Amino acid sequence: MAELYIDADACPVKAEAERVAVRHGARMYLVSNGGIRPPAHPLVESVFVPEGPDAADKWIADRAGTGDVVVTSDIPLAAKAVAAGALVVKPNGETLTTANIGNALATRDLMADLRSADPFRQGGGRPFSRADRSRFLDALERAMRKAAEAARDAGQDEAGT
């Protein structure tokens, strides 16, 4: 069965992800260093990791694999999850795959270099929108179906069928 891992710190789509996970009967892990409400549904588990750089990312990367779905905006975590065979969906609905994760990493690094070169630069990305939320729900639904299929196929392969 597919599992859903949410990089929950500052994730704007936790409630939407929970609804999709429950509908699919999938276990969901909300991974953060605190500050989120415990979920009410038994399929949804809050995982609190120690404060520190990338503790939530490490927890997710150590567990996610083929047949799982990871929701994150963190590109290095997404790269690790993709390498492990997981499907990755960003909160804006963009999917990250082996075909595009290299470009995403390069763009991230370039933008970090540009920001560090201009200390007076202000602003950030555009605000999260209803359209982003809608794209996310569509992408997560497709990813959960694909992950369930991959998990089913992996189970059949292990059973020798």
Curated annotation (Swiss-Prot):
<dbReference type="Pfam" id="PF02639">
    <property type="entry name" value="DUF188"/>
</dbReference>
<dbReference type="InterPro" id="IPR003791">
    <property type="entry name" value="UPF0178"/>
</dbReference>
<protein>
    <recommendedName>
        <fullName>UPF0178 protein Rsph17025_3122</fullName>
    </recommendedName>
</protein>
<comment type="similarity">
    <text>Belongs to the UPF0178 family.</text>
</comment>
